[in-house]
């Protein structure tokens, strides 16, 4: 019973923490050096870092360099999150079998399901919450970076290439690029997933559209951040968690298993003929 309660408690915490982070980060007022809250100070620190990286006063260059720096620092966590999610996907068929086996709602059945699920996680070296920790660490960092671009006045000035960073891109090239890289990152993330679900498939197309239309009205500095961040994620996925290689390896193992079973059947037939 304690194991069941512990699992339920962990699930509740996993749901509440992101909500709390979002509520803490939802301020819209201008952030300055005199801002007193800890969150606003973090936002201002990020803004000063972007300003420091703005060579020749180009805030656009600062946004790009700081975004790349943050993404590089978070890369190990992102990689951990992806690998953990893949492991969870791999054991989903066995988890569903357990859920069918222990479909009852009584306490004893739920306890047995929790025990065997934990045994399955241990067998494959899977921590069901390992994919949540990197996300919880990344979330406040990325929100603080976003707010630095929207709430600190000195980051809303200047130009980069053809755009005024405080205005929307009148050529709409940045929203298009942001949408394209958002699509590629979500598509590549979902590509190697063994079991597709409707929600993920919908998000592959909905997220880029949301980014595209939001980019029409948002400051170009924010859209530039989205573009660079998602472009980095595409490259990162191709280098560290290439879905095409994962699919090819999965197919190779499946073919080897098929060949092994075929050899076993042939060996059994030969043994039967000799008898």
Curated annotation (Swiss-Prot):
GO terms for biological process: protein insertion into membrane; protein transport. It is found in: Cell membrane. One of its GO terms (molecular function) is membrane insertase activity. Coiled coil: none annotated. A lipid is attached at residue 26 (N-palmitoyl cysteine). Keywords: Cell membrane, Chaperone, Lipoprotein, Membrane, Palmitate, Protein transport, Signal, Transmembrane, Transmembrane helix, Transport. Residues 1-25 form the signal peptide. The keyword Disulfide bond does not apply. CDD domains: 5TM_YidC_Alb3. It is a multi-pass membrane protein. A lipid is attached at residue 26 (S-diacylglycerol cysteine). GO terms for cellular component: plasma membrane. The chain crosses the membrane at residues 58-78, 129-149, 171-191, 198-216, 222-240. Its main location: membrane. The keyword Transmembrane applies. Required for the insertion and/or proper folding and/or complex formation of integral membrane proteins into the membrane. Involved in integration of membrane proteins that insert both dependently and independently of the Sec translocase complex, as well as at least some lipoproteins. This is Membrane protein insertase YidC 1. It comes from Streptococcus pyogenes serotype M6 (strain ATCC BAA-946 / MGAS10394).
